[in-house]
Amino acid sequence: LEDKEKQVTVPVAEMSREDKMLARWKEKQAHLWKNLPTDPFIINASAYTAAADECGKSDGITASGIKVTEKRTLACPPAFPFGTKIAIEGMGEFRCEDRGGAIKGNKIDIYMETKSEAFSFGRRNLTAQVIQ
């Protein structure tokens, strides 16, 4: 007998606003999910804020339509669909929710609340792994 993965369906009414937004993107970006890396990989990480001089606007709304949140929001290259969860060495788990003009290849931007945090972070090569 083949084991089939059990799938849990969460009623839409119980989903958070963010999860509803990401569910819409999941359908549109379904073709990307099968090509995600399964092994750890090196990212060239930098940090950004929601300041108008960095993003062209200051409302904190990401390309996926979700409001930025520190210790959660990543700007990822287009190869990573919105909602992809990525564990980053020494930093924790994040979710791809945004894009950026310079975010291509192995570059990832980590959202931080303040410019001083972002400048202090600088640019680092870190090990990352897709966890969903």
What do these predicted ranges mean?
Residues L1-Q132:
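Solvent-exposed, well-ordered loop and adjacent helix/strand elements within mature globular domains
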